[in-house]
Amino acid sequence: MTYDRVALKARLKLEEGEVLHAYQDSLGWWTIGVGHLIDGRKGGAIPPGVSDALLEWDLARVERQLDQAIPWWRALDDIRQQVVMDLTFNMGWAPNAPGGFDDFHDTLAALQGGRWADAGAGLRKSLWYRQVGSRRAEPLCVAVETGVFRS
């Protein structure tokens, strides 16, 4: 006999609760969803498939933000679209808060105008570049300037 999986899931959601953000359970262990342990101290983790699903969800959110705020980004070539997505994913797009990629007014204007060297220079002179370091930032600057990701 096979158990009723739908009924079990409903019962567990009632008993455990469903929390869609990380929280500490009654014993202080980091948990998410319906009692899913993510606390590394107890061996908690998420499987790669869940990580990929979260990444897909985040990328779709970033695309929606960019489509609404700067629809011209879709006219960029593939590499420069990837850079815009990467930077927005990394820094966020938060018009009502400082620190997001939306604050890069000169760089965004350079991208929109096809002034690739200016866009790269704008990235290099930013706080973001200093914070993440050249190892992470320089490949994106070069990609903006050349339209190629170098390995």
Residue ranges and their predicted role:
Residues 1-21, 36-40, 50-59, 63-67, ...:
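Long, amphipathic alpha-helical surface segments
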Residues 5-6, 48, 75-78:
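Alpha-helix N-capping/helix-start residues
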Residues 8, 26-28, 80:
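Residues that flank catalytic or metal-binding motifs in active/ligand-binding sites
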Residues 11, 31-33, 83-88, 118:
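Structural recognition of the beta-strand scaffold that forms the well-ordered cores
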Residues 20-23, 67-80:
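Surface-exposed patches in mature extracellular/periplasmic domains of secreted proteins
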Residues 24-43:
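Substrate-binding/active-site groove segments that recognize
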Residues 44-45, 74, 109:
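Helix-turn-helix-type domain boundary/helix-start signal
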Residues 73-102:
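Mid-chain, well-packed structural core segment of small domains
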